[in-house]
Curated annotation (Swiss-Prot):
Subcellular location: Cytoplasm
Gene Ontology CC, one term: cytosol
Motif 'KMSKS' region location, chain numbering: 628-632
EC number: 6.1.1.4
Taxonomic classification: Bacteria, Pseudomonadati, Pseudomonadota, Alphaproteobacteria, Hyphomicrobiales
Organism of provenance: Brucella anthropi (strain ATCC 49188 / DSM 6882 / CCUG 24695 / JCM 21032 / LMG 3331 / NBRC 15819 / NCTC 12168 / Alc 37) (Ochrobactrum anthropi)
Main subcellular location: cytoplasm
Key word ATP-binding present: yes
Name of the protein: Leucine--tRNA ligase
Length: 877
């Protein structure tokens, strides 16, 4: 009998309600089973989820459901990364309070995520803007302050003139603010910092332990931490050109071997020598101001045009006092890195070469490839940066650069300048302390109080939390907390005098740097329950975008170590396994120069050529490139529309099936329709056979068709489990397609009433296994299929979501037959399929019975038959 068409809208709502009432996915911390913590990066509540969210959370849900089925006590929570500038922008534009805007968005997105059927423990849900959460964050801040891991200092900062706030170096991308896109300026402000540099060596060494992280992410962090071993060299200033009070410049270099190729010394615009020289030089003052118009990070400097200002000051070469080098103020030298001064060797550093060519400085090669002729070796437009042999370097000639490094270091360490060595070996890190002060309202208040008599002190713990005031105005840019009439005024906790609160709030990356720990016991009064946190952490599988490789992931690694120092956790690394999924991309469409949404067009195909037209007018539409889904280009597909049309399981299945999870997936309507057809096919096959299978006990087949279909199912159980363990979801999907294709005829035979008892038992067993394997990916369909079969697994009534992963029989997984190529006189003519354990005589006999062998021999006997066991057969005619 034909089954009714599967209705995902009805089925999915039903099973979501069942799971909620059953509290299927709530996690008990006291459960004694082995733990497994899977976490996807929690979302910012921007208003609606997008297909990228669907892919990210579908992947995490497959892992969570699979691990539950494998017997683990799984923690799979969800929350909201809810502070940040967009809420303030919305407040200014729409006259709505950030809190109201944020919680409305959370309600919408929570409903959307629930419609996906995710196996989340919603009982642990929190938003980082919840007072209960940022109260504990303020407790952590004070703990870290008391441990010496928080400091306040004046420094050059990246100022975003549009968002009117400070940005960390990591938040400046190509010289622009990561959110606003505005060109960043340098300003000098007093800021709060986390002393992440105290952990530079630890953070670097810890990367070697993260063998379940992508190598690309580890390399990005390794480069960002930027450990270098070099030499700090004192260059004597020429007394005739140097200003009063300055006798030397200290230079940090990682290439002291190239000293004889030096063409100039570059100093930072903030170097004391530059500031002194600018006192009487208006042109230099103007150049220094120009240098302050870009970000403070190395990345910002690397992308800016290289510029310099010749100060007229000279320095003497460390090995030749008659050799003078010009001193430039250079816009690519950072005061915060090394000593704020470098020497430039144009032949062996591309930046220095570009600079030297611009200012017509001498280029002298001092390293050349082995085997080259020194007299004929020169540098063109590209610096030589590889290894080789030293040239044009006096006593270093003929050495390797490594040997030359040590020779220069040894000589200068033994040379006195004044009362100390002219050089010393130093280790430097590119990593800077994390400036967390933000001049905005919608963030976690920094719990500090400023008193003219007592200085700056923490808010007493009894007075926490410092709550954000609700009565603020967003009628102009800047921080409303600075303008609040009463909130900022407070008594000093030490002397009782009038004082003021800190009005800066914390960088929102602080909020996401410890949330994974809070999820382990979000009801605790302390930031963590140490015993519970140490049980659950580290997160076993973390899933999110590679765009967070430096910012969020590095900060979280620091925060875990800082929390360990403060006694809140006992681990070093927060995330044992990291998976970075690809993006969801879509075609772009344009009509009359304007972007057009996919929902507003129709696609047609004629003679293999695709064309598009507007639904409203039929006007032609240009089909553009495939790009990341973005609102600006309107190539966005709303998950609500997909779920309403096809169901959540279809959306999940397509997101998992179309490409390897680490690669981008191209969303297509055809792909979604194909996934939906598979959903309907599975339902139809199971539902039409259900009446004949309801009361049948599952049993593995032993012969004929029953054995064939049982073997296919057992092989799939092993393979799909292996695929999920490796996060190779698309391969698991492909195997399930294969199993359905293999089992379809048997299911149809059962449905027609023509199956014997053995086949029915085998098909019941295969169907149960299929349902259990589909469940992590299409959980609603799996529950509906089991329900139509009577709601039992192995004779016991249960939910699929509470059922174990199916077992496989190793004997049925092993291939009992092998395929051996057959050659005649050394050339392959065909194949022989034979039992794996067949002896040599049996193989020879079987080969001689093959039609193509008989034809080749033409009635004659072969001279010999050579058998390489389980590999190949060669018939010599």
């Amino acid at each position: 009998m034909a089954a009714e068409r599967y209705n995902p809208r009805v089925a999915e709502a039903h099973w979501q309600k069942v799971w909620e009432e059953d509290r299927t996915f709530e996690t008990d911390n006291s459960d004694s089973r082995e733990k497994y913590y899977v976490l996807e990066m929690f979302p910012y509540p921007s208003g609606r989820i997008h297909m990228g969210h669907v892919r990210n959370y579908a992947m995490g849900d497959v892992v969570a459901r699979y691990k539950r089925a494998k017997g683990f006590n799984v923690l799979h929570p969800m929350g909201w990364d809810a502070f940040g500038m967009p809420a303030e922008n919305a407040a200014m534009q729409n006259k709505v309070h950030p809190k109201e805007w944020t919680y409305q968005n959370i309600a919408t997105m929570r409903s959307q995520l629930k419609s996906m059927g995710l196996s989340l423990d919603w009982a642990r849900e929190f938003a980082t803007c919840d007072v209960e959460y940022y109260h504990r964050q303020q407790m952590l801040f004070i703990d870290l302050f008391e441990k010496g891991l928080v400091t306040r200092k004046t420094s050059k900062v990246n100022w975003d003139p549009v968002d009117n706030t400070v940005l960390a170096n990591e938040q400046v991308v190509d010289g622009r603010g990561w959110r606003s896109g505005a060109l960043v300026e340098q300003r000098e402000l007093t800021q709060w910092f986390f002393k992440i540099t105290d952990f530079s060596e630890e953070l670097l060494a810890g990367l070697d332990t993260l063998d379940q992280w992508p190598e690309k992410v580890r390399l990005m962090q390794r480069n960002w931490i930027g450990k270098s071993e070099g030499l700090q060299v004192r260059f004597t200033l020429d007394g005739k050109t140097a200003p009063e009070g300055f006798s030397e410049v200290e230079v940090y270099t990682t290439r002291p071997d190239t000293l004889f190729g030096a063409a100039f010394v570059g100093i930072s615009a903030d170097h004391p020598l530059a500031k002194k020289l600018a006192e009487n030089n208006a042109s230099l003052t103007g150049f220094i101001e120009e240098c302050h118009q870009h970000g403070t990070s190395l990345a910002a400097l690397e992308t800016a045009e290289k510029k310099g200002f010749d100060t007229g000051v000279k320095v003497k070469h460390p090995f030749d006092e008659n050799w003078e080098l010009p001193v430039y103020v250079a816009n690519f030298v950072l005061m915060e890195y090394g000593t704020g001064a470098v020497f430039g060797c144009p032949a062996h550093d591309q930046r220095d070469l570009d600079f030297a060519n611009k200012y017509k400085l001498k280029v002298t090669p001092v390293v050349m490839p082995k085997g080259e002729d020194a007299a004929g070796f020169s540098i063109g437009e590209t610096a030589y940066t590889d290894d080789g042999v030293m040239i044009n370097s006096r006593f270093l000639d003929g050495m390797t650069p490594e040997a030359a490094f040590n020779e220069v270091a040894n000589r200068l360490e033994q040379t006195s300048l004044g009362n100390s060595p002219q050089a010393s070996r130093k280790v430097q890190f590119r990593l800077r302390d994390w400036g967390i002060s933000r001049q905005r309202y919608w963030g976690c208040p920094i719990p500090m109080i400023h008193c003219e008599s007592c200085g700056v002190n923490p808010v007493p713990r009894a007075d926490l939390p410092v709550k954000l005031p609700d009565d603020v105005e967003f009628d102009r840019p800047g921080n409303p907390l600075d303008r609040h009439a009463t909130w900022r005024h407070v008594k000093c906790p030490k002397c009782g005098a009038d004082a003021r609160r800190e009005t800066d709030t914390m960088d929102t990356f602080v909020d996401s740097s410890w949330y994974y720990a809070r999820f382990t016991a979000p009801w605790e009064n302390e930031p963590t329950d140490r015993k519970v946190a140490d049980h659950w952490l580290p997160v076993d599988q973390y899933i999110g975008g590679i765009e967070h490789a430096i910012l969020h992931l590095l900060y979280s690694r620091f925060f875990t170590r800082a929390m360990k120092v403060a006694g809140h956790v006992g681990i070093d690394e927060p995330f044992k396994g990291l998976f970075t999924q690809g993006m969801v991309v879509h075609e772009t469409y344009k009509a009359n120069g304007q972007w057009v949404a996919p929902a507003d067009i129709r696609i047609e195909e004629t003679d293999g050529k695709r064309s598009a037209a507007l639904l409203s007018t039929g006007e032609p539409v240009e089909i553009g490139s495939i790009e990341k889904m973005s609102k600006s280009k309107k190539n966005v597909v709303d998950p609500d529309d997909i779920i309403a049309s096809y169901g959540a399981d279809t959306a999940r299945w397509f997101m998992l099936s179309d490409s390897p999870p680490e690669r981008d997936v191209i969303w297509t309507e055809a792909g979604a329709e194909g996934a939906h057809r598979f959903v309907q096919r599975v339902w139809r096959l199971v539902a039409e056979a259900a009446e004949h299978l309801k009361d049948v006990a599952p049993k593995t087949g032993t012969q004929g068709e029953a054995l064939v279909v049982s073997k296919a199912a057992h092989k799939a159980v092993k393979a799909v489990g292996d695929d999920i363990e490796k996060l190779a979801f698309n391969r698991g999907v492909a195997r399930l397609y294969e199993l359905v294709n293999t089992a379809a005829a048997s299911l149809q035979q059962v449905a027609s009433g023509n199956a014997d008892d053995e086949l029915k038992s085998a098909v019941r067993d295969v169907t149960e296994k299929l349902i259990l394997m589909l469940a992590p990916m299409m959980p609603h369909l799996a529950e509906q299929c089991l329900a139509v079969l009577g709601g039992k697994i192995a004779g016991r009534e249960t939910l699929v979501a509470r059922s174990a992963w199916p077992e496989f029989d190793p004997a049925l997984v092993v291939e009992n037959e092998i395929v051996m190529p057959v050659q005649i006189n050394g050339k392959k003519r065909g194949d022989l399929t034979i039992a794996r354990d067949a002896d040599q005589a049996s193989i020879q006999q079987a080969v001689l019975e093959l039609d193509f062998v008989k034809a080749a021999l033409n009635g004659s006997s072969p001279k010999k038959v050579i058998v390489v066991p389980q590999r190949i057969v060669n018939v010599v005619a």
